[in-house]
Amino acid sequence: MSVALSNRFQGGKAFGLLKARQEKRLEEINREFLCDQKYSDEENLPEKLAAFKEKYMEFDLNNEGEIDLMSLKRMMEKLGVPKTHLEMKKMISEVTGGVSDTISYRDFVNMMLGKRSAVLKLVMMFEGKANESSPKPAGPPPERDIASLP
């Protein structure tokens, strides 16, 4: 049954188990980062790692522990910054160092904690600010008459 889980896109108990396993895997990687001396001077590291885990799980659409090109495309569209295929391939290459076509959680955390400025990092950092400043209008659009049209 576990072999078929990764290929089925459904909710319910199977999806909950899949997400629980994914969260456990990401939590283990977070513990590795917390124990790593390289990141010991990083302030608010546990809070940052928890936020990174949430974002990563949100955009890991295939639940395989990697963000692929289509997941990245959806993420950028959701953030209001659509990119071309070529731009997204370049972003993935920058994050992974050209080694892979997908972004693993380790690569994602290294990018977010790293010193170099990645496009994806900037988008992720400012996502919250952009969402707060421009709330989407609710309800039906206002009525217009012919005189108000251009």
Swiss-Prot record:
Its main location: cytoplasm. GO terms for cellular component: actin filament; cytoplasm; focal adhesion; ruffle membrane. The modification Phosphoserine is found at S2, S134. Residues 129-150 are annotated as: Disordered. The keyword Cytoplasm applies. It is a peripheral membrane protein. The modification N-acetylserine is found at S2. Ca(2+) binds at D60, N62, E64, E66. Gene3D superfamilies: EF-hand. It holds the Pfam family AIF-1. InterPro entries: AIF-1_EF_pair, AIF1/AIF1L, EF-hand-dom_pair, EF_hand_dom. It is found in: Cytoplasm, Cytoskeleton; Cell projection, Ruffle membrane. Keywords: Acetylation, Actin-binding, Calcium, Cell membrane, Cell projection, Cytoplasm, Cytoskeleton, Membrane, Metal-binding, Phosphoprotein, Repeat. Residues 47-82, 83-117 form the EF-hand domain. One of its GO terms (molecular function) is actin filament binding. Actin-binding protein that promotes actin bundling. May neither bind calcium nor depend on calcium for function. Homodimer (Potential). Monomer. This is Allograft inflammatory factor 1-like. The lineage of its organism: Eukaryota, Metazoa, Chordata, Craniata, Vertebrata. The gene is Aif1l.
